[in-house]
Every structure is written in structure tokens, then in C-alpha cells.
Amino acid sequence: MGIQAAEISAILKDQIKNFGQEAEVAEVGRVLSVGDGIARVYGLDNVQAGEMVEFPGGIQGMALNLESDNVGVVIFGSDRDIKEGDTVKRTNSIVSVPTGDELLGRVVDGLGNPIDGKGPIKTKTTSVADVKAPGIIPRKSVHEPMATGLKAVDSMIPIGRGQRELIIGDRQTGKTAVALDAILNQKSYNDAAGDDESKKLYCVYVAIGQKRSTVAQLVKKLEETGAINYSIVVAATASEPAPMQFLAPYSATAMAEHFRDNGRHALIVYDDLSKQAVSYRQMSLLLRRPPGREAYPGDVFYLHSRLLERSAKLGDDAGNGSLTALPIIETQGGDVSAFIPTNVISITDGQIFLETELFYQGIRPAVNTGLSVSRVGSSAQTSAMSSVAGPVKLSLAQYREMAAFAQFGSDLDASTQQLLARGARLTELMKQPQYSPLTNAEIVCVIFAGTNGFLDKVDVKDVGRFEEALLNHMRSKHSDVLDWITNEDPKIKGDAADKLKAAISEFASDFA
């Protein structure tokens, strides 16, 4: 059976026509050594710093050390399946994560992959994890309040939208509780805002190096309260490799910036940055970078400053969005002068200092009002709050000073005794159970009662009961006053003070 020449040429022509001209070219290298989450790779000559590379089996890594003869790559995942001689491919893209509203209500890892078992997340946009912070021109000074619902914080250490307020304290002093209450407190504001995006606040919580059980507990609380609907949880738990714990805060910030850059508002909680610094130290030492103070690398300040500078209040031309940050730092034995705490204190716009001693005395949240400050928040405080909260900080400072002296002398004059009595009641008034944030108007009423002598005749042990009963009275009989404070935001002096005094007096006369 002979094959016709024409047939042969037709087959050849057909094959030539269908031949793909596009040859896939990928720059590949080979693994020289691997261990402790670090791979040394030879042959990736044109790789960029911070570029994503791919190992066999889809494991991803990031090129961090570009040396003359090899590249130091940190591995996002288990290094058990990577061996010497494996090929490593460039992806030609800097480490990016998915961003968008589709992430709300979900729990993701440091690369944006879902880990809550609710199926894949289909986002329309991705963003580079470690982008440059906004410059000076697009920014605006902080002027809108970011209410936490905690009396001690909102009255004395106010936080504004676009601020970075550090929460610092030893282990088990309630640092996460303060941040979680701030997230839960947004529910009433977001519900009241309806479709008005300029009033809503979206929340991103980043767990760095925490126990999985702790993160699961927190997610459960967010789900129970319905706060998960406006929140994203990014988890790089203690069992994740160090590169994931290092990357998670940057990824989460990229997710939060989606809201900031679209004229909306977001709050991000980093829990906690001490563990991120530790994982970065581990990576740096394994990459053979020279150690500095406390064996941290020389650029550990830049690690945190470039992260926290991305939280900002943008001006009118940039859409008026904001990103507020609550970084958490854990101290050892109350030592605020250690390397990482001093670094982050100098980067942030104030700190909430929590003390073990106060916590064990039952003063919770255990805020040390003397050492805690808010450097820019006072301009963001509501008029009503700033007009009633002024005397509180002064009274408590005088009380602390006098209480120290009062231990020595028994015969105190009447004015000192009165100052001590009021200080004790105000301290009691600042206590607040977890998961029970109050609205701005409610805090104004409570503090007004405390500073205007309504508590002077109440026993210290009954202050909590007085506060609860007062709030119930205001909600049931004087909800118009609460609404007036919320909507009008009046300065509480003159007629406004008389109006509030009348409402509280009516209750105080019957309280027993």
C-alpha cells in the first residue's frame, strides 16, 4: 500500500501549522541545601528580592538573600518534601495575597488560603503583601473617633481612625481582650450605619504564633456575636513555620488596605508583634545575617515601622479612607525598656499599658492610666466625651499620688479624704467585664455621674451595681437623652449638663 506524496505533504503541513510557536521558558535553579525552613538555591540569577518561587509539589517560597553564588529562600510550608537537587522555578511575581470583600467572615492563612473549611474564596483582586506606605501628601490628621466601648480607653486614652495605638503588657494581662472588645463594639455602629460605608468599620485580626485553641475560641466568639460578618481573621499559629508568622501581618495589612484605599475604614489588630520579631530573628540567623542587640537583626526596627506606617488616615483627594492599627506587644516582667517594646512605642501614636498587679487586684481592663497615653486621639474624641472626661485623668492621677502618702499618715484633712474617696470610686467605675462594650453616650453618662459627685454617697462595693442600674434607667426612661448625645454630640456644660444632671438625679435619689 503506497502513501501518496501529496498526502504526506498535507500531513506535514497540518502538523507544522498546529505547531505552537510559544516555547515556555522558565528560569529554574537547583536546591543546594535545605533545612529549618530555609533553602539555598543555585541558578536563579535574575530573581528579585521578595519574589515568590515555586518548589516541586506546589510549595512556595520567597527569595530573601541574594548572594553572589546562591539565593537564600524562606519556605512557606513544610520543607520535608524538598530535597537537594530539586528544581526551583521563578514565578516573576512579588509575594501577593487575595484582597476584597469576599474575605469578610473568613479565616485564612498568611497567604490568603482559607483554613475554616467553608470552601474556596473567589476574590476579584490581589495585592502585593509588602507595599510602600502612603506618602505625606495623601494623608490627613486623625480627627474621627474609633470607639472601643471601654470606659477607661474611650475617656482617657481615646483612639482615632487612622491612629496606631500600642497595647502593651505582660502575658495574661488582658491584651487580646481589649482588642477583641474593640472589634465587638463596632457591631452596634455598623448596624446603625446601614448602607453608609463612611461610618462602618471593618476589622482584621492577625494571630501570630498563637495556640490554635486560642484562635478557635476567638473565632467562635466573633461568630456568636455576629461580628465575624465584618471581620477577617488571618492566622499564622505556633505550629506554622517562621516565614508564615513573618508574612502574616503584611498579608493582613494588604487585605485591610483594600478598605482604606476605597474610601472605607478598617481596624487591624496584630496579636502579637513580639512573636513576629522572634520568627524574623530566627529566619535572619538561619540566613546567616549578622545579629545585633538581643540577637535581633539590624533591620528589625524597619520590619515593624514599614508595617505600621501603612496605617493612616487619608485625605479628601485619596478618598477619605482610614486604617487604624492596634499592635500588641508582650513584655517580660513589665520591662518596657527592652528592644522590641521601645522600638514599637517609638513608631506608634501612643500606648495602652496593662499591668499584672492591677489585673490581680481585679481592676480589669488593667490599664495603668499614668503610663498610658494617646498622642493624637484627643483631637478625635467626641465633644461630649472630652468635656466630661477631662477631670477623670487628673482625679485618678491625684488619687494615685495621695494613696501612696495616705499609707503613712492616718490624720488626713477633709479635702484629702474627699479626694481619696472619689478616686477609689472612679477606679471602681473604670472596671468593666469582658464582652460588654458600652456606647459613647452611655460612657458619657457614667463618667459624668462619677465626676459630678453622684457616687460620693455610694459605697465603693456598690459602684458597679449603681452603674448598671443607672444605665438601665437611662435606656428605659431617658433614651432621648442618650440619642441626643449620640446624634448632636453636645459639649456637656451649661444647659446640657443640667439636662444630664436632672436625668441622673432622678435615679440617684431612689438608689439604695
Curated annotation (Swiss-Prot):
UniProt superkingdom: Bacteria
Q: What class of enzyme is it?
A: translocase
Look up and give the membrane topology term.
Answer: Peripheral membrane protein
- Gene Ontology molecular function: ADP binding; ATP binding; proton-transporting ATP synthase activity, rotational mechanism
**Which PROSITE patterns does this chain map to?**
ATPASE_ALPHA_BETA (PS00152)
Q: Which UniProt keywords apply?
A: ATP synthesis, ATP-binding, Cell inner membrane, Cell membrane, CF(1), Hydrogen ion transport, Ion transport, Membrane, Nucleotide-binding, Translocase, Transport
| HAMAP family attached to this UniProt entry | ATP_synth_alpha_bact (MF_01346)
CDD domains given for it? ATP-synt_F1_alpha_C (cd18113), ATP-synt_F1_alpha_N (cd18116), F1-ATPase_alpha_CD (cd01132)
Q: What is this protein called?
A: ATP synthase subunit alpha
Spell out the residues of the site Required for activity.
S372
One Gene Ontology cellular component term attached to this UniProt record is: proton-transporting ATP synthase complex
Q: Which family does it belong to?
A: Belongs to the ATPase alpha/beta chains family.
Family matches, as InterPro entries: ATP_synth_asu-like_sf (IPR023366), ATP_synth_asu_C (IPR000793), ATP_synth_asu_C_sf (IPR038376), ATP_synth_F1_a_nt-bd_dom (IPR033732), ATP_synth_F1_asu (IPR005294), ATPase_a/bsu_AS (IPR020003), ATPase_F1/V1/A1_a/bsu_N (IPR004100), ATPase_F1/V1/A1_a/bsu_N_sf (IPR036121)
Q: Can you name the source organism?
A: Roseobacter denitrificans (strain ATCC 33942 / OCh 114)
Q: Localized where?
A: Cell inner membrane
Residues reported in the UniProt entry to bind ATP: G169, D170, R171, Q172, T173, G174, K175, T176
Main function: Produces ATP from ADP in the presence of a proton gradient across the membrane. The alpha chain is a regulatory subunit.
Residues folding into a coiled coil are none
- What EC number(s) does this enzyme carry? 7.1.2.2
Complex formation: F-type ATPases have 2 components, CF(1) - the catalytic core - and CF(0) - the membrane proton channel. CF(1) has five subunits: alpha(3), beta(3), gamma(1), delta(1), epsilon(1). CF(0) has four main subunits: a(1), b(1), b'(1) and c(9-12).
Mind telling me which Gene3D superfamilies this protein's record contains?
Answer: 2.40.30.20, ATP synthase alpha/beta chain, C-terminal domain (1.20.150.20), P-loop containing nucleotide triphosphate hydrolases (3.40.50.300)
* Catalysis: reaction(s): ATP + H2O + 4 H(+)(in) = ADP + phosphate + 5 H(+)(out)
